[in-house]
Curated annotation (Swiss-Prot):
Keywords: Ribonucleoprotein, Ribosomal protein, RNA-binding, rRNA-binding. This is Large ribosomal subunit protein uL18. The gene is rplR. GO terms for cellular component: cytosolic large ribosomal subunit. CDD domains: Ribosomal_L18_L5e. One of its GO terms (biological process) is translation. Pfam families: Ribosomal_L18p (PF00861). Belongs to the universal ribosomal protein uL18 family. InterPro entries: Ribosomal_uL18_bac-type, Ribosomal_uL18_bac/euk. This is one of the proteins that bind and probably mediate the attachment of the 5S RNA into the large ribosomal subunit, where it forms part of the central protuberance. One of its GO terms (molecular function) is structural constituent of ribosome. It comes from Photorhabdus laumondii subsp. laumondii (strain DSM 15139 / CIP 105565 / TT01). Part of the 50S ribosomal subunit; part of the 5S rRNA/L5/L18/L25 subcomplex. Contacts the 5S and 23S rRNAs. Gene3D superfamilies: 3.30.420.100.
Amino acid sequence: MDKKAARIRRATRARRKLQELGATRLVVHRTPRHIYAQVIAPNGSETLVAASTTEKAINEQLKYTGNKEAAAAVGKAIAERALEKGIKDVSFDRSGFQYHGRVQALADAAREAGLQF
């Protein structure tokens, strides 16, 4: 099993458990150059809020989009947008990525901005 297949297996297992709970999910995806975050409805078929480093408003504030500072900016933006829509409690879905570095920076920034998970 290669590295990507192992990550996808971990992500699938976690998502199955979150779906059983019926929780609103904060989903994170990262690439070497960008980081993406979405808040997905409990039924899994609707994206309620999204933010990423590819957005012009976030991208203009950053020198580089593939670091912890960029992840923190996305975390703050996703939390602010979720709170505007009345979403306070979410379950953190790290998509099989290690809770370390950019994923952790995004989560910490979202918590500081008011999301609870």
